């Protein structure tokens, strides 16, 4: 292949690529590559980047974080704003970009540089995806500011599967607006830590998302949280509490209080009152009996589970690596 230079003549060669080849290239790229790179090569690539099939899923889970840009205060606590690497604003311009795209396509290598905030990235994505996305997955450590969540909900109202990160500080008004837009939501994955972000408004979810049947909750499950889930999410059929802290009382509450629940996953969970004790070893017999009588599947881990024995696996860094995994297939992403 000849060396690519940033001249109009050679750009036209890229513009004239066969549509099938262009489709292969775009399918090889991720959201960041398309939004901040390929869509800016030439007009034909820009038009191709609007293809709805590219935007069924907006997957931001693999964004590579740069150093925190600055610290801001939120409710007397300091919180980070993350920026992400992307393949533009490089001194070599188009030549460098095309080289990276071809390297990614043929060699599975794509180095990215520069930075962009999450809010600005959502703006750029919405210009190309329009209202096509049905799945929206944030990076585990992303911080979604209030206007960012509102913007995502307004521009992507057809979301059916959503993964919200642990740094998601929202007031009641912003959550209510967001979920009022996501009326088609079927699956919700929440990485939530009460000490970081306060209470999550499950009432706002329940009032707007009548089609929600799948929920995954990662975090220390407070008793009030389990009561709210039972009170407001009556349509749940599948619930996963994988890899965190939950009590026998809460498990029993879910089994008996959620009328449509068929599958409950408590694998790798620990007792919140004894971090050394896996829930599988501490769960009471009355809970087992209730699960056996009602549920189609009650997922626990074996008593000799190596994950449960490793306390380091319950750190946030570990959860950031595994939160996409689940024994319930509907909750994988």
From Swiss-Prot:
Species for this entry: Arabidopsis thaliana (Mouse-ear cress)
Annotated protein name in UniProt: Putative F-box protein At4g11580
Source organism phylogeny: Eukaryota, Viridiplantae, Streptophyta, Embryophyta, Tracheophyta
Range of residues in the leader sequence: none
Ranges for domain F-box: 11-58
Gene3D superfamilies: 1.20.1280.50, Ribonuclease Inhibitor
């Amino acid at each position: 292949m000849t060396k690519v230079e940033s001249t109009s003549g050679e750009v036209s060669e890229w513009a004239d690529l066969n549509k099938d080849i262009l489709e292969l290239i775009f399918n090889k790229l991720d959201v960041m590559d398309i939004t901040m790179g390929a869509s800016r090569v030439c007009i034909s690539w820009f038009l191709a980047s609007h293809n709805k099939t590219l935007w069924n899923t907006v997957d931001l889970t693999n964004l590579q974080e740069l150093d925190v840009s600055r610290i801001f205060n939120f409710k007397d606590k300091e919180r980070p704003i993350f920026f992400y690497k992307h393949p533009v604003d490089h001194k070599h311009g188009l030549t460098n970009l095309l080289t990276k795209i071809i390297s990614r396509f043929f060699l599975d290598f794509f180095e990215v540089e520069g930075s962009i905030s999450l809010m600005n990235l959502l703006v750029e994505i919405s210009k190309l995806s329009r209202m096509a996305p049905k799945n929206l997955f944030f990076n585990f450590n992303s911080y979604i500011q209030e206007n960012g969540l509102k913007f995502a909900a307004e521009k992507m109202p057809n979301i059916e599967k959503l993964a919200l990160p642990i740094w998601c500080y929202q007031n009641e008004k912003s959550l209510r607006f967001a979920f009022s837009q996501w009326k088609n939501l079927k699956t919700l994955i929440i990485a939530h830590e009460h000490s970081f972000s306060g209470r999550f408004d499950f009432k706002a979810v329940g009032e707007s998302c009548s089609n929600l049947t799948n929920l995954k909750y990662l975090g220390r499950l407070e008793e009030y949280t389990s009561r709210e889930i039972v009170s407001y999410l009556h349509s749940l059929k599948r619930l996963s509490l994988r890899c965190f802290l939950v009590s026998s009382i809460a498990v029993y509450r879910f089994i008996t209080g959620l009328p449509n629940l068929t599958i409950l996953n408590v694998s790798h969970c620990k007792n919140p009152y004894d971090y050394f004790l896996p829930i599988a070893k501490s769960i009471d017999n009355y809970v087992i009996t209730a699960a056996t009588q009602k549920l189609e599947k009650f997922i626990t881990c074996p008593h000799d589970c190596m994950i449960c024995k490793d306390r380091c696996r319950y750190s946030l860094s570990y959860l950031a690596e595994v939160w996409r995994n689940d024994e319930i297939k509907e909750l994988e992403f």
